[in-house]
Amino acid sequence: MSHQHTTQTSGQGMLERVFKLREHGTTARTEVIAGFTTFLTMVYIVFVNPQILGVAGMDTSAVFVTTCLIAAFGSIMMGLFANLPVALAPAMGLNAFFAFVVVQAMGLPWQVGMGAIFWGAIGLLLLTIFRVRYWMIANIPVSLRVGITSGIGLFIGMMGLKNAGVIVANPETLVSIGNLTSHSVLLGILGFFIIAILASRNIHAAVLVSIVVTTLLGWMLGDVHYNGIVSAPPSVMTVVGHVDLAGSFNLGLAGVIFSFMLVNLFDSSGTLIGVTDKAGLADEKGKFPRMKQALYVDSISSVTGSFIGTSSVTAYIESSSGVSVGGRTGLTAVVVGLLFLLVIFLSPLAGMVPGYAAAGALIYVGVLMTSSLARVNWQDLTESVPAFITAVMMPFSFSITEGIALGFISYCVMKIGTGRLRDLSPCVIIVALLFILKIVFIDAH
């Protein structure tokens, strides 16, 4: 009995030393509950990411495992080195950009696309090392940041509607409505509304519940074949190490590489600031403890992710669900990471999820990201016009890169044209000029 008590006490002492629970006004029990809560809100990524990367021709079973592995790696590293209640996983939006644009639309092999992700992550790591990253966040205006986030939201939403069959290609009108009497379309729509209704009622596992319900209904209708629940993890060798560094290191992909880097920069940094602020860890300027360590973990996770065969890794805003139930330290993130490791043994379940079950999650994430347009000052046309152009050009040009490029250029045009040169930071001018050079010397040839 005394031995058991001693072991328990030493375990608690170790947790206290590593995570400083008392200092943060929390307990191990609270942190574990917070970890479970965050995990339930973001575990949908292990079902959705393989579906999306599968479009690029990647082995979905292997991607399921690598998604779990990189989510575990990033989350555990964030917990141990930055002691923050923030979990990481492959980014929604950038996975769609990789699969639908870089591979499908541009016709590049997925190995080259992974190379572009790698170089973008290396760029992000260098910006972090030389402390340029926070300078860029501080000097790029809210309207452009919001335009980028919202544009990716519209792009993801469009992909979700397409995957559900709600919209289909039409040579005369570009797109038109699909067959709304088809059971797969109806299940895709149902999946989205299940998420939206449950999320509005503050049910953290809304996306997971939707995927389970629509998959079960698909099974009842004969679309889904039961393959068991637990099995040994499938081989990952079809995707691990298949990154084409030489093929992706060329000027023609400069815009794509820059897009991966810039979007990840805003996405992760914005999430880290938002979650730490909600946890009461950030100051009035948005700075939080161990910020440098957090940014390093984020960058290194993306580099690692590209090598093992998954898209750009980012901090997840779903981490705020764990914070809302008391998560304050890295123990929350470590719990999330350990749970992702356990999920690896549930690969047969991931193989059963039909495309329309994942489509609802895509549309919902699109809604969440597009809602940030509310932060734009619509009364100031020098801010609202670039935000609008950035957002709408992503789905309409079918390219996140073009949306970012036209957003930065239009921001400079509006500020110069109205004589408000003081609003232009060197950062915005440099990025706009780089995109102009890309359009003139690369895209034109």
From Swiss-Prot:
Cellular localisation: Cell inner membrane
Effect annotated for changing residue 267 to E: Strong decrease in activity
Record GO biological process: adenine transport
Main localisation: membrane
Effect listed in the UniProt record for changing residue 267 to A/N: Lack of activity
Effect of residue 271 to D: Lack of activity
TM regions (residue ranges): 29-52, 63-81, 84-100, 113-132, 145-165, 182-199, 204-222, 251-279, 293-308, 311-326, 331-345, 357-376
Entry-linked InterPro entries: Azg-like, Azg-like_bact_archaea, NCS2
Family membership noted in the UniProt record: Belongs to the nucleobase:cation symporter-2 (NCS2) (TC 2.A.40) family. Azg-like subfamily.
Residues spanning the signal sequence: none
Regions of this protein lying in the Cytoplasmic compartment: 1-28, 82-83, 133-144, 200-203, 280-292, 327-330, 377-381, 418-445
Pfam families: Xan_ur_permease
Ranges in the topological domain labelled Periplasmic: 53-62, 101-112, 166-181, 223-250, 309-310, 346-356
Result for mutant: residue 38 to A: Almost no change in activity
The protein's name: Adenine permease AdeP
Keyword Transmembrane helix attributed: yes
Gene name of the encoded protein: adeP
Domain of life: Bacteria
Effect on the protein of changing residue 319 to A/N: Almost no change in activity
Keyword Transmembrane: yes
Membrane protein topology class: Multi-pass membrane protein
Gene Ontology CC entries for this record: plasma membrane
Activity regulation note: Internal adenine may inhibit transport.
Alphabetically ordered keywords of this record: Cell inner membrane, Cell membrane, Membrane, Transmembrane, Transmembrane helix, Transport
A GO term, aspect molecular function: solute:proton symporter activity
Residue spans that sit within the membrane without traversing it, per the record: 382-417
